[in-house]
Amino acid sequence: MVSIIVSPVLCIRVIDDVEEPHHYVINLLSNQSAVDVCFGPLLHTYIPRSLDTMSHPARISLRAPPHLPFIQGFPGIPGGPSRRPPGVHGTVEIRVGAVPIKAKWVRVEIRKHEVIPPGFKTSSSEDRSTWEHVGEIQTLWTPQNTTKEFDVLETADFKFFLPLPENIPPTVMMMKESGIRYELVAAVCYKQKGGMFKKDASSVNKTTEDLRITKHELNSAWPLYNQPDTFNATAANGAIEMIVQRPYSAFGPNDRILLTAVLKSSQPKPFRVKGFECTLLEVVTVTQIPSSQDKKKPKKVAPPTTKSRTVATARYPIDETLGRGGEKSARIDIPMAPDKLLVTVRNGRSIEVGYELEVKAVCEGIPELAVKGIKYVVGPFSRAHSQQAVR
């Protein structure tokens, strides 16, 4: 390698045989910019290899409070006298090197990303993923002299607090990296010197941290979810009735669904009751968001698309005859496998997740009798952990 000093600000380095014989690279260093030019066998042919190899003059990083996570409080639950409001706490650290920089602003924000799961039709691949700000963008630093667009930024730490709205959906990871996720983004906008071949321009250096939002209003121990209720369905002009009773309407991973099913008959003709079947469905609803990049006249908004899958089943055999004035009942216990459940998702921009239970009486000699659409809330914790959190 041969290095030739042309001027105090320009250095030419010629490196032989970089990729192929008789090919050379000339690296031009000017001020804080660098350009690599690759020459072929003929000197008048060249290919730019890197138009900007400079690193950022300031390092930016995010740091959570000492021995604490970024997220404080209980997302989904408002703050109170003894409970801090839910939000993201932390510090943006700016570290400037030996060369001073001029900056325009330092900001921090929360972004929510929603990726539609596979199997749902979208108009384009771009429409499958959307993102939006959560709350306001917080500006931590600007030039003190309001007449200046840029000013010198020194090494500093900026503490911040970003409140979390109560109605945001929780983090949920679905198949093939789809679902809802959040990230904390900190950025600094500074003036980048162009050097010999480029004009001065602004550049943005940013850093991100993943945030996992757990919604505590979904905890199954809240009194709202522990009020018994009843559902019913009839057949044969009301002569046959099925009643489903449940003690609570929410559960979490490793919990069990408990309910009682009762079948009554007032018709003269007896029939055989084989048993009860229960099916818990996970219902995913996707609302397609039109792309903001589409400059054409917006088309008619497509209705939401819903798909369901079975996440748990239970059967209770009876195999007895039911006559006029008689009844058959069963206490049904449905265990929940933790690896098959997500959580209830409300207020998503494009994704919502719900859970519905269907209880069916399997009989011979009468029309199908079923109670459908019994809604449940699925939280992030088991009932035992939820009780501790609520206390």
Give residue spans per PLM region.
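Acidic, Ala/Val/Gly-enriched low-complexity intrinsically disordered segments
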Residues: V2, V6-V9, D17-E19
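C-terminal beta-sandwich interaction modules and adjacent acidic
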Residues: L10-V14, P21-R391
